[in-house]
Amino acid sequence: MDKNKTIRIALTKGRLEKAAVEIFENIGLDCSELKDKGRKLIFHDFKNSIDFVLVKAPDVLTYVEHGAADIGIVGKDTLLEMKKDFYEVLDLKVGKCKFSLASISSFKLNEGFNRMKIATKYPNVTREYFREKGIDVEIIKIEGSVELAPILNLADAIVDIVETGTTLKENGLVIFDDICDISARMIVNRASMKLNKDRITDIIQKVKNYVERES
């Protein structure tokens, strides 16, 4: 093990970024470069030999799985949708939301003989949910505003991430089932855990202690 080796941490851009930075600052890491990004792609904490990279959620999984990053911070939604090979080591208790089934108020989950159409950004999560219920559905992959699908009769219902439910209510949609809770997770590359066990375990423990204090 090289104690001076730089540990690379991949952070999810967007809603989880701020929460992750707050956590790392509170365990003593220097995240100042992340607050003055400019056009930089890699952000350094020279004192602690840490590099941060900001990438889209699916790419966090890819970077960590292939060893381009040692540690990743990503939402459980992405982990459930994209099965990859790494260690999931911590629930960070931030970025909390849930997967929910929603539609217009007249929707009936088990009524009728027609195969239901379900619109979602998360086809694998949706497929598994209905498989467990023994319901055969057609899944329509949507990249944009999923809430439009039942309103425009593209789909009977949607499966999407819900934080407050405000967007659903504003569009006349109702939650029919909460599928599972979601929050930010810490993941670690398998080889990195062996090669840099002491340093990575130290980071994990410090983050765990902080999360437990704040929970």
Curated annotation (Swiss-Prot):
Taxonomy, superkingdom: Bacteria
Catalysis: reaction(s): 1-(5-phospho-beta-D-ribosyl)-ATP + diphosphate = 5-phospho-alpha-D-ribose 1-diphosphate + ATP
A cellular-component GO term for this protein: cytoplasm
Claim: RNA-binding is one of the keywords in the record: no
GO BP: L-histidine biosynthetic process
EC class name: transferase
Gene3D superfamilies: Periplasmic binding protein-like II (3.40.190.10)
GO molecular function: ATP binding; ATP phosphoribosyltransferase activity
Classification via PROSITE patterns: ATP_P_PHORIBOSYLTR
Disulphide linkage map: none
Compartments it resides in: Cytoplasm
EC numbers for this chain: 2.4.2.17
Assembly, per entry: Heteromultimer composed of HisG and HisZ subunits.
Similarity comment: Belongs to the ATP phosphoribosyltransferase family. Short subfamily.
Function: Catalyzes the condensation of ATP and 5-phosphoribose 1-diphosphate to form N'-(5'-phosphoribosyl)-ATP (PR-ATP). Has a crucial role in the pathway because the rate of histidine biosynthesis seems to be controlled primarily by regulation of HisG enzymatic activity.
Name of the protein this chain belongs to: ATP phosphoribosyltransferase
